[in-house]
Swiss-Prot record:
Substrate binds at residues 176-179. GO terms for molecular function: 4 iron, 4 sulfur cluster binding; dimethylamine dehydrogenase activity; FMN binding; metal ion binding. FMN binds at residues 229, 329. Keywords: 4Fe-4S, Flavoprotein, FMN, Iron, Iron-sulfur, Metal-binding, Oxidoreductase. Coiled coil: none annotated. It catalyses: dimethylamine + oxidized [electron-transfer flavoprotein] + H2O + H(+) = methylamine + reduced [electron-transfer flavoprotein] + formaldehyde. The modification S-6-FMN cysteine is found at residue 31. The keyword Iron applies. ADP binds at residues 398-427. Binds 1 FMN covalently per subunit. Binds 1 [4Fe-4S] cluster per subunit. GO terms for biological process: catabolic process. The active site is at residue 181. This is Dimethylamine dehydrogenase.
Length: 736
């Protein structure tokens, strides 16, 4: 299909100093868990975006020196020749598809804890990092106040890193000053308390950054386009950088040294104000700030705001708010987003849902990222998975999939892409499984994009292969139904449900009196069904670390109920990693929801629950003989009155159908069945991203020797003395 001519402006080349970006799509720097020690992963993941039409593709934050070692988080480095060699794999792959490659020069100050290098960073003043106190970080980290000699040494570290980036082949060198990193700590009065010529007035606080840009420009000349990433407002009011004060003044002051501005808002402790989750922030949520940048510079501007909608992209470019569409998460969800716009396939875009699960993996530290929408993200190199290309089927075995949730619908989509005849059966009115329920919770409406993408693709694939079928609103299938169905391969994707009796991870037993068959006790599924009345006083018993309990609390508080949450773990603790945590806590406070932390439930009765502090038995331990606990009896139990109890304790796989079929394996051959598989939550409850991955994986590997269990993937391993597998080809090999 041809591109809609309305979008032509998005494909207009633009000069960036000595370089030219071929269109207006710019993958801003973002972490992916590869660093420089997994060059294959980095090369393949970034390269697929260049293939997909992103005109410029950047590294993640790239440490310039051991002083800014960001371990425990995995990030790139450009310290030496070895790093250059590993990064060159990405550069060459990006260039092979006609895109520019960019390197973001990172110096974190105390925000980079240097756990591996054990060095101390330098900064304008001494301060301890507010970022280092978030979950997953190692307590407080401090820097050293730089004297003039150390300041100049730091500037030279930037220059040396810029030269290494140029010699690696990068087209763009980006001095990272957003998210309270590097030069922003000198500009920002929140950090800079100096009284010499590098502190105090605006001109003095801007001096370090300006001098650094001058020195880099002299060193690299016009060999690269020079970029700086800048937070134009740190959202701290007069205590930080404000847009209409230091923000625009700095844009004007630094513009002569730059070829491109990469702008955003916020700091690092709450960088979800920039990488805004869809729960709180819509597309283009930074525009109230970014729309003013062009008045202070004549240089091109790239801005972000989770741009996933081509119409919104067109709007902001035509309005002159920004010149280039910057994106991280939308480029992860769909590496081919620009190409699909170019080819007139807008409805094929795999839209970012804004859940920030990708970010959560980096926030946890040490793990490669994942994507809820795109199961191939991070798997391109090690598994050879291309997001848009698939191996043709290797047999004529048709497949019956029972359950059209995240795992089942993704498995069906990929199998149909490969040419298999698939029958997808579900009891619900729509595909998507429990995503349909989750998307009804406050702020989570855009999570329905996960369902919508798969539904659209399945409908298209049905037209290509009329023998395929999607059967919705069906009665639950039995083992007899499946044995008689006639499919060669059977995939059970029946999902999971919340425990109806309060079984939880601390006791692995039901909570006495907790019984969701009673009118005053509900599971989340029963809340979604809406068949049970909910009383004025709602008590949520929470043993889960993610979104369900806080979302239900918000739902009922907004509806006028008095809500209390008794929670064993931090309420929505995992949401700290998805950058939803701070605003969720503000919202909980604003709505008057009462949170009882470190609190378990020992009994449920009509009209009340018995709660206890989980540490109430005291710390002293002694051996008291068989049948006796080593600590004192917990005496902190108290009764709390309520009208309705909601159990958010644990999820249990709905695997009865799978186990019945396995028990009747002797009947498979006579009924033409060769394999029965179980995937997604039906195998083990997990987040949507991992359930989707599991369905995708089975569809890719269904002809392998043991498809139920994933095949080994290619590891990027440093082995002592020799390669881990000397016969293994290190090149990227697509399974297409």
């Amino acid at each position: 299909m041809a591109r809609d001519p309305r979008f032509d402006i998005l494909f207009t080349p633009l000069k960036l100093g000595s370089k030219t970006i071929r269109n207006r799509f710019y993958q801003v720097p973002h972490c992916n868990g590869a660093g420089t020690n997994s060059p294959g992963m980095n090369m393949a993941h970034r390269g697929i975006k260049a293939e997909g039409g992103w005109g410029a593709v950047n590294t993640e934050q790239c440490s310039i020196h051991p002083e800014c070692d960001d371990t425990l988080r995995i990030t790139a480095r450009i310290w030496d020749q070895g790093d250059m060699r590993n990064l060159r794999a990405m550069v060459d792959h990006v260039h092979s598809h006609g895109s520019l490659a960019g390197c973001e020069l990172f110096y974190g100050g105390p925000h980079a804890p240097a756990i591996e290098s054990r060095t101390i960073s330098r900064g304008p003043s001494q301060y301890n990092s507010e970022f280092a106190t978030v979950p997953g970080c190692p307590g407080f980290t401090y820097n050293h106040e730089a004297d003039i000699d150390e300041l100049e040494r730091l500037q030279q570290q930037y220059v040396d890193a810029a030269l290494r980036a140029r010699d690696t082949g990068f087209d763009l060198v980006n001095v990272y000053g957003a998210h309270a990193y590097g030069p922003m700590q000198w500009l920002n009065p929140y950090y800079n308390r100096r009284t010499d010529k590098y502190g105090g007035s605006f001109d003095n606080r801007a001096r370090f950054w300006i001098e650094t840009l001058e020195k880099i420009r002299r060193a690299v000349n016009d060999d690269v386009a020079l970029v700086t990433r800048c937070a134009t407002d740190t959202l701290y009011g007069t205590k930080g950088v404000e847009l209409t004060e230091d923000g625009l003044r700095f844009i004007e002051l630094a513009s002569p040294y730059l070829d491109l501005w990469d702008v955003n808002i916020g700091d690092i402790a709450e960088w979800g104000e920039d990488a805004g989750p869809s729960r709180f922030y819509p597309i283009a949520h930074e525009n109230d700030w970014i729309r003013h940048i062009k008045q202070a510079t004549n240089k091109p501007v790239v801005g972000v705001g989770r741009y996933y909608d081509p119409e919104k992209m067109l709007q902001v470019i035509k309005a002159g708010i920004i010149d280039i569409i910057g994106a991280a998460r939308p480029s992860i969800a769909d590496p081919w987003l620009p190409r699909k716009i170019d080819e007139g396939r807008v409805d094929d875009i795999r839209t970012c849902i804004g859940c920030n699960v990708c970010i959560s993996r980096w926030e946890m530290g040490g793990v490669p990222f994942i994507c809820t929408q795109n199961a191939t993200a991070g798997e391109e190199y090690r598994r050879g998975w291309h997001p848009e290309k698939f191996e043709p089927k290797k047999s004529d075995h048709d497949v019956l999939i029972v359950g059209a949730g995240p795992a089942g619908s993704e498995c069906a989509r990929v199998l149909m892409e490969r040419g298999y005849t698939v029958h997808l059966v579900d009891t619900r009115e729509k595909t998507g499984g429990y995503v349909n329920d989750v998307a009804t919770l406050p702020g989570l409406g855009e999570w329905s994009f996960h369902r919508d993408y798969r539904q659209t693709q399945l409908e298209k694939l049905l037209k290509k292969n009329p023998e395929c079928q999607i059967a919705l609103k069906q009665k639950p299938m039995t083992a007899d139904d499946i044995l008689q169905y006639g499919a060669s391969r059977v995939v059970i994707a029946t999902g999971a449900k919340w425990s109806t009796t309060g079984v939880n991870h601390r006791t692995h037993e039901p909570i006495p009196g907790a019984d969701a068959s009673l009118p005053h006790v509900l599971t989340p599924e029963q809340v979604y069904e809406g068949k049970k009345a909910v009383g004025k006083r709602v008590m949520i018993i929470n043993y889960d670390a993610y979104y369900t309990a806080p979302s239900l609390a918000e739902k009922f508080a907004r509806a006028g109920h008095d809500v209390t949450v008794a929670t064993v773990c931090g309420l929505g603790a995992y949401m700290e990693y998805t950058l939803e945590g701070a605003n969720m806590q503000r919202l909980i406070h604003e709505l008057g929801i009462k949170v009882l932390g470190e609190t378990g439930c020992s009994r449920v009765e009509q009209g009340r629950v018995e709660l206890f502090n989980i540490w109430g038995e005291g710390y002293k331990r002694s051996y008291k003989g068989a049948g006796q606990l080593p600590r004192n009896e917990n005496t902190s139990h108290e009764w709390h009155e309520c009208d309705t109890v909601i159990l958010v304790t644990s999820r249990r796989s709905e695997d009865t159908l799978y186990r019945e079929l396995k028990a009747r394996k002797g009947e498979w051959e006579a009924n033409g069945i060769t394999n029965v598989f179980v995937i997604g939550d039906a195998e083990s409850p997990r987040i949507i991203a991992d359930a989707t991955f599991d369905g995708h994986r089975l569809a890719r590997e269904i002809e392998d020797a043991d498809p139920q269990h994933q095949k080994p993937y290619k590891r990027e391993q440093r082995a002592w003395g020799t390669a881990y597998n000397p016969d293994e080809n290190p090149d990227l090999v697509w399974r297409v």
